[in-house]
């Protein structure tokens, strides 16, 4: 039988409400840049999607007032940010912490699905292909973002580790040795 999903931290409501004040679309540019870097560093992600490499995926953090739409492509991957979820091939919805935890291997996807903390709609085969591609790549979003920060990387990793400890949200891979109890500088 599947394990019980742990209690998942939710994004603070006041911060989520504040996100409603500005436009969502400009968030797409930095997210697209991060996604393109991930694809460049992990080109097998696109290949692993197989027949779903042209699918559009809605990633819907249910505790935030926006939806991310992933358009995978070997060189032109794009993430668009919308207030309302547009029509896509597959929609994966759940609290932001659960979605990040799936990427980092901190949560069991089956347990989240059967506990209804994670909802899959549309083409479930496409969603499964995306999940398998991400699992195989062993992505570390915290490390990828830190790498983008150039000379600030040494200072950023301890900050990411501290934020992870304080919030309980998986911001990097669970097995990342850089998340030792380093002091925040």
Q: Residue spans of the language-model regions?
A:
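Feature captures hydrophobic
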Residues: 1-185
């Amino acid at each position: 039988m599947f394990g019980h999903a742990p209690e998942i931290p939710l994004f603070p409501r006041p911060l989520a409400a504040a996100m409603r004040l500005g436009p969502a679309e400009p968030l797409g540019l930095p997210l697209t840049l991060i996604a393109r870097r991930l694809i460049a560093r992990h080109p097998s992600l696109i290949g692993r999607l197989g027949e779903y490499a042209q699918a559009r995926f809605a990633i819907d953090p249910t505790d935030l007032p926006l939806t991310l739409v992933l358009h995978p492509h070997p060189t032109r991957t794009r993430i668009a940010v919308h207030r309302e979820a547009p029509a896509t091939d597959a929609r994966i919805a759940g609290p932001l912490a659960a979605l990040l935890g799936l990427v980092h291997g901190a949560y069991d996807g089956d347990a989240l699905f059967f506990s209804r903390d994670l909802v899959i709609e549309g083409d479930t085969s496409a969603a499964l292909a995306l999940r398998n591609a991400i699992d195989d790549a062993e992505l570390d979003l915290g490390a990828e973002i830190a790498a983008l920060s150039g000379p600030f990387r040494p200072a950023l990793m301890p900050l990411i580790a501290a934020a992870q400890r304080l919030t309980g949200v998986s911001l990097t891979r669970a097995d990342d040795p850089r998340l030792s109890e380093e002091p925040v500088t």
